[in-house]
Swiss-Prot record:
Binding, ATP: 63, 68, 85-93, 345, 370-374
Keyword tags: ATP-binding, Cytoplasm, Helicase, Hydrolase, mRNA processing, mRNA splicing, mRNA transport, Nonsense-mediated mRNA decay, Nucleotide-binding, Nucleus, RNA-binding, Spliceosome, Translation regulation, Transport
Highest classification ranks of the organism: Eukaryota, Metazoa, Chordata, Craniata, Vertebrata
Motif position, Q motif: 41-69
Organism: Xenopus laevis (African clawed frog)
Name by which UniProt lists this protein: Eukaryotic initiation factor 4A-III-B
Gene Ontology terms for molecular function: ATP binding; ATP hydrolysis activity; mRNA binding; RNA helicase activity
PROSITE patterns tied to this protein: DEAD_ATP_HELICASE (PS00039), HELICASE_ATP_BIND_1 (PS51192), HELICASE_CTER (PS51194), Q_MOTIF (PS51195)
InterPro entries: DEAD/DEAH_box_helicase_dom, Helicase_ATP-bd, Helicase_C-like, P-loop_NTPase, RNA-helicase_DEAD-box_CS, RNA_helicase_DEAD_Q_motif
Length: 414
């Protein structure tokens, strides 16, 4: 009706008017949660199967986070959902619980497909699914590049209820007919903004074309740029929107500071001075390039500091053993690129250092959102050269937050 009215006034075709209206809708989509979203305060009242509830409590969850209270029920109902949610809010468990609830374990075919931007995140999702589904006998495979194709095919032939993976490898497996899509009921796009940043748009569309027409779609993203809204328009039917306003995206309980360093070389001395503070719990130090990670790691070790490091060029096996070491607490300081900033969950991390300020402001939330997960307290310290001040102010404004100069007693705050 609205489209016809617009068409009448402007002398446009109805189809064109509809598109204009849709574009108008898109500009406002970011700022509201759909009215029909109610809040379910406990896992017990979500109507979940008994064996899944056991898995949830065994995993250590007690009370659902805000996004879980709103989204799980809607996804289980079969609605298409757009959730704007950053890391550290329990978004992975949100769709893992929902996916597990919707499976028919008796049928050994792929019923849910989860796409993620990085191998690490896909593996993390697989781990969470297997842990939460521990009492359900769920089969779940991570389908990611850089691993043996033959092994992938063997696993898929065996029968997997859920496949989590990166778009390239998943599409490859569908094309080879190893991943059969006929029983798929649900597609989850995790960190959709990052998948688009990495140039996966074509592959996501390719995968989508192979899925049954009635497939339910859930999309999770920290930001909702235009391209994402375009995608939701194509893939989704009357989606429910569950959105966190941008100024809530800076996780509460994280104290943010900056240290002014006049020159790049001074960052290293500053870091050495802070080392004792770093090892109080566990810390992650972010650099913007792989080369910088390698350089800083070597320099720290030369100065007799114990650190471990990780970036995207390392072989999968090596990255996994480094992560395992860090998770177990055997290593306390990890130097990394942004490959780590997405979806990897180490609860003990309570200090983040941005040795380099991130290249874009969205990454800032992914990095520091890690340090106070699920309401835990955390501290973030940004090393800022003179020409970085502008970027820092931009980040402050974007997240309507305050980043103060680091006090002398920073160790007491951790």
């Amino acid at each position: 009706m609205a489209a016809a009215a617009v068409a009448g006034v402007a002398g446009l075709t109805t189809a064109h008017a509809k598109r204009l209206l849709r574009e108008e809708d898109m500009t406002t989509v970011e700022f509201q949660t759909s009215e029909e979203v109610d809040v379910t305060p406990t896992f017990d009242t979500m109507g979940l199967r008994e064996d899944l509830l056991r898995g949830i409590y065994a995993y250590g969850f007690e009370k659902p986070s805000a996004i879980q209270q709103k989204a799980i029920k809607q996804i289980i109902k079969g609605r298409d959902v757009i959730a704007q949610s950053q890391s550290g809010t329990g978004k992975t468990a949100t769709f893992c619980v929902s996916v597990l609830q919707c499976l028919d374990i008796q049928i050994r075919e792929t019923q849910a497909l989860i796409l993620a931007p990085t191998k690490e995140l896909a593996r993390q999702i697989q781990k969470v699914l297997l842990a939460l589904g521990d009492y359900m006998n769920v089969q779940c495979h991570a389908c990611i590049g850089g691993t043996n194709v033959g092994e992938d095919i063997r696993k898929l032939d065996y029968g997997q209820h859920v496949v989590a993976g990166t778009p390239g490898r998943v599409f490859d497996m569908i094309r080879r007919r190893s991943l059969r899509t006929r029983a798929i009921k649900m597609l989850v796009l995790d960190e959709a903004d990052e998948m688009l940043n990495k140039g996966f748009k074509e592959q996501i569309y390719d995968v989508y074309r192979y899925l049954p027409p009635a497939t339910q779609v859930c999309l999770i993203s920290a930001t909702l740029p235009h391209e994402i809204l375009e995608m939701t328009n194509k893939f989704m039917t009357d989606p429910i929107r569950i959105l966190v306003k941008r100024d809530e995206l800076t996780l509460e309980g994280i104290k943010q500071f900056f240290v002014a360093v006049e020159r790049e070389e001074w960052k290293f001395d500053t870091l050495c001075d802070l080392y004792d503070t770093l090892t109080i719990t566990q810390a992650v130090i972010f650099c913007n390039t792989k080369r910088k990670v390698d350089w800083l790691t070597e320099k720290m070790r030369e100065a007799n500091f114990t650190v471990s490091s990780m970036h995207g060029d390392m072989p999968q096996k090596e990255r996994e053993s480094i992560m395992k070491e860090f998770r177990s607490g055997a290593s306390r300081v990890l130097i990394s690129t942004d490959v780590w900033a997405r979806g990897l969950d180490v609860p003990q991390v309570s200090l983040i250092i941005n040795y380099d300020l991130p290249n874009n402001r969205e990454l800032y939330i992914h990095r520091i959102g890690r340090s106070g997960r699920y309401g835990r307290k955390g501290v973030a310290i940004n090393f800022v050269k003179n020409d970085d001040i502008r970027i820092l102010r931009d980040i402050e404004q974007y997240y309507s937050t305050q980043i103060d100069e680091m006090p002398m007693n920073v160790a007491d705050l951790i």
